[in-house]
């Protein structure tokens, strides 16, 4: 279904309710630049670096797009998805059945979920929705739940330390969304709905979270304007 959630005036903050879940795949593919390319890149990196039967957790897995991309390359892996939205997991389960993919999918708050013994953890465009006061503790949890040599891959929207550059990037991004068929009204509506819900960090702040948690290295593997994907090694 085509995303038309913000064509109507909104009266609440953004949440992943039924109205969003029903159009989520269209929404994210038109709202996040190079979304499909990022999923493909993550899948390729993990497929090259993980041992047979390695355990992968996608935290905030939404409709399981990333897990299904990995499954296409490495069906031997233990693929696990966690999302707090029951509607998201229902859609993910239906998709996994359609692909004949053996995915383990859980409805849970990722802050409370036990994913110990992981070989890889994925966190795509999810950390930005976690309250800043809880982010450092959560990244430390990811580090402690990964096995030695484990991989942490995450994607985030960014702010820049230079305020003018941040504003320029916001304008460039909103022009991108307009080119994807969103009206200026829809763009403004979503921006308002996400205010104080999606709180991005800078590239350096995201890297510092990983290094402070104990990861031995962290690199940016993809970046476009105010979006980036990172990889960290335990």
UniProtKB/Swiss-Prot annotation:
<dbReference type="InterPro" id="IPR005271">
    <property type="entry name" value="CmoA"/>
</dbReference>
<dbReference type="InterPro" id="IPR025714">
    <property type="entry name" value="Methyltranfer_dom"/>
</dbReference>
<dbReference type="InterPro" id="IPR029063">
    <property type="entry name" value="SAM-dependent_MTases_sf"/>
</dbReference>
<comment type="subunit">
    <text>Homodimer.</text>
</comment>
<feature type="binding site">
    <location>
        <begin position="60"/>
        <end position="62"/>
    </location>
    <ligand>
        <name>S-adenosyl-L-methionine</name>
    </ligand>
</feature>
<comment type="function">
    <text>Catalyzes the conversion of S-adenosyl-L-methionine (SAM) to carboxy-S-adenosyl-L-methionine (Cx-SAM).</text>
</comment>
<dbReference type="GO" id="GO:0002098">
    <property type="term" value="P:tRNA wobble uridine modification"/>
</dbReference>
<comment type="similarity">
    <text>Belongs to the class I-like SAM-binding methyltransferase superfamily. Cx-SAM synthase family.</text>
</comment>
<feature type="binding site">
    <location>
        <position position="35"/>
    </location>
    <ligand>
        <name>S-adenosyl-L-methionine</name>
    </ligand>
</feature>
<protein>
    <recommendedName>
        <fullName>Carboxy-S-adenosyl-L-methionine synthase</fullName>
        <ecNumber>2.1.3.-</ecNumber>
    </recommendedName>
</protein>
<dbReference type="GO" id="GO:1904047">
    <property type="term" value="F:S-adenosyl-L-methionine binding"/>
</dbReference>
<keyword id="KW-0808">Transferase</keyword>
<dbReference type="GO" id="GO:0016743">
    <property type="term" value="F:carboxyl- or carbamoyltransferase activity"/>
</dbReference>
<feature type="binding site">
    <location>
        <position position="124"/>
    </location>
    <ligand>
        <name>S-adenosyl-L-methionine</name>
    </ligand>
</feature>
<feature type="binding site">
    <location>
        <begin position="109"/>
        <end position="110"/>
    </location>
    <ligand>
        <name>S-adenosyl-L-methionine</name>
    </ligand>
</feature>
<keyword id="KW-0949">S-adenosyl-L-methionine</keyword>
<dbReference type="Pfam" id="PF13847">
    <property type="entry name" value="Methyltransf_31"/>
</dbReference>
<feature type="binding site">
    <location>
        <position position="191"/>
    </location>
    <ligand>
        <name>S-adenosyl-L-methionine</name>
    </ligand>
</feature>
